[in-house]
């Protein structure tokens, strides 16, 4: 029996759903799939770097950065489309800029001099998208000029370690703002509805949703027909996966190209070329 190794680099609050996804693939393809939760950044993971991962649930930014240096790049198997009007039946999610409900922050410019927290610097929703937004904001303030040396928009920036921690920091007053993965936030508010009373979204930045990816090696190793069946298990889910998708508020799975994620890489590159960090 074919055995596949799968890893999730995404938030653990939907790990149960990723288990349902890989089980659906296993049923359709008559294979065994082991799913593990990552304990390090994808770019630091020797298993991924040595092409020992077959399937990966991964954020768009580390996907792009990994593929720039990988001998065997990752390819997109399928992408989820979330339920809810804000997602417009498109494979997108948002970096929701969250503040305390009782704060005096109402728009992005109000955040100057505030305390910012982020899950980690490798995160698209938690760091990359907000950095790009901030860079655009500062360039509008200083047109045709380089940013002043050692310019700081935020009074303080701290790594919280996770989106969940960032939400708790804001609710408890340890931080003023954070950019939060909209899917992670929705799950947290379903699990802890009382948290919603302490939080408010002042702006949302759309981006391509984290995809399910496979090593390009699988085409030669298992054949294009096998990969097609893997993909079909998501595009045409069985009853068991449909039930899990409903609980996870996933409307459907669809196809996507790695080129759809180029904008994420462009935002990252602009932040790097400007030598700009949120500090």
Enumerate the predicted regions with their spans.
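Acidic, polar ligand-binding/catalytic clefts
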Residues: 47-110
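Short loop/turn segments at beta->alpha junctions
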Residues: 39-40, 59, 162, 181
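Bilobed "Venus flytrap"/periplasmic-binding protein-like clamshell domains
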Residues: 2-28, 38, 89-166, 241-251, ...
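Periplasmic-binding protein-like
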Residues: 78-94, 193-231, 246-259
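Short, hydrophobic alpha-helical packing/hinge segments within bilobed ligand-binding/sensory domains
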Residues: 43-47, 53, 63, 163-169, ...
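A ligand-binding cleft/hinge motif common to bilobed small-molecule-binding domains
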Residues: 57-71, 135-136, 169-172, 176-196
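Segments of small-molecule ligand-sensing domains
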Residues: 33, 225-279
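A short beta-strand-loop structural module common to alpha/beta enzyme folds
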Residues: 31-41
């Amino acid at each position: 029996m074919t055995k596949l190794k799968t890893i999730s680099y995404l938030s653990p609050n939907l790990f149960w759903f990723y288990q349902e996804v890989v089980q659906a693939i296993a049923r359709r393809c008559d294979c065994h799939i082991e799913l593990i939760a990552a304990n390090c950044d994808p770019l630091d993971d020797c298993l991924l770097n040595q092409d020992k991962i077959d399937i990966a649930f991964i954020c768009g930014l580390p996907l792009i950065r990994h593929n720039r240096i990988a001998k065997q790049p990752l390819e997109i198997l399928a992408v989820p489309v979330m339920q809810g009007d804000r997602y417009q039946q498109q494979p997108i999610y948002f970096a929701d800029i969250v503040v305390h409900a009782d704060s005096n922050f109402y728009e992005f410019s109000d955040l100057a001099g505030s305390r910012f927290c982020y899950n980690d610097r490798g995160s698209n929703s938690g760091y990359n998208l907000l950095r790009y937004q901030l860079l655009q904001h500062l360039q509008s303030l200083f047109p045709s000029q380089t940013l002043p040396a050692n310019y700081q928009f935020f009074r303080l920036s701290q790594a919280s370690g996770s989106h969940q921690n960032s939400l708790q920091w804001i609710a408890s007053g340890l931080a003023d703002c954070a950019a939060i993965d909209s899917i992670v936030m929705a799950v947290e508010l379903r699990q802890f509805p009382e948290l919603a009373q302490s939080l408010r979204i002042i702006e949302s930045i759309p981006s391509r949703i984290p995809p399910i990816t496979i090593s390009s090696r699988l085409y030669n190793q298992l054949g294009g027909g096998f990969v097609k069946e893997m993909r079909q298990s998501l595009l045409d889910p069985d009853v068991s996966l449909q039930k899990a998708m409903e609980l996870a508020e996933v409307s459907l799975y669809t196809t996507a190209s790695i080129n759809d994620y180029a904008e994420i890489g462009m935002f990252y590159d602009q932040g790097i070329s400007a030598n700009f960090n949120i500090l």
